[in-house]
From Swiss-Prot:
Organism: Rattus norvegicus (Rat)
Biased composition range(s): Acidic residues: 87-108
GO biological process: anterior/posterior pattern specification; negative regulation of transcription by RNA polymerase II; neuron differentiation; skeletal system morphogenesis
Subunit structure: Interacts with HOMEZ. Forms a DNA-binding heterodimer with transcription factor PBX1.
Protein name as annotated: Homeobox protein Hox-C8
Compartment annotation: Nucleus
SMART domains: HOX
PANTHER family associated with the record: HOMEOBOX DOMAIN-CONTAINING PROTEIN, HOMEOBOX PROTEIN HOX-C8
Biased composition (Basic and acidic residues): 73-86
GO CC annotations, alphabetized: nucleus
Gene (UniProt): Hoxc8
Stored Gene3D superfamilies: Homeodomain-like
Length: 108
């Protein structure tokens, strides 16, 4: 069942509903808002929720999910395990430095 704004509404009172379905209009407006600013102030979240017929919580969670999607999309450029390779390289450099220090100490 849908409410007046086109949002799927099928939860019993006091129970969490399943996955939220947003209308095209709501999704477009949320995306536009996200492009303008990926973080909302409480005041702006209230304005957006009233304008779109959503709860503040729905808007807040939509933005959290959208930021995670954006973060994942931007991390695709990096190869999997790139951080691990950097860490191994740093550890290798530390070992080389220790060996050089030991050689210098042994010379004396």
């Amino acid at each position: 069942r849908h409410n007046q704004t086109g949002v799927l509404f099928c939860s019993a009172p006091g129970r969490r509903s399943g996955r939220q379905t947003y209308s095209r209009y709501q999704t477009l407006e949320l995306e536009k808002e996200f492009l303008f600013n990926p973080y909302l102030t409480r005041k702006r979240r209230i304005e957006v929720s009233h304008a779109l017929g959503l709860t503040e919580r729905q808007v807040k969670i939509w933005f959290q999910n959208r930021r995670m999607k954006w973060k994942k999309e931007n991390n695709k450029d990096k190869l999997p395990g790139a951080r691990d390779e950097e860490k191994v390289e740093e550890e290798g450099n530390e070992e080389e430095e220790k060996e050089e220090e030991e050689k210098e100490e042994n010379k004396d």
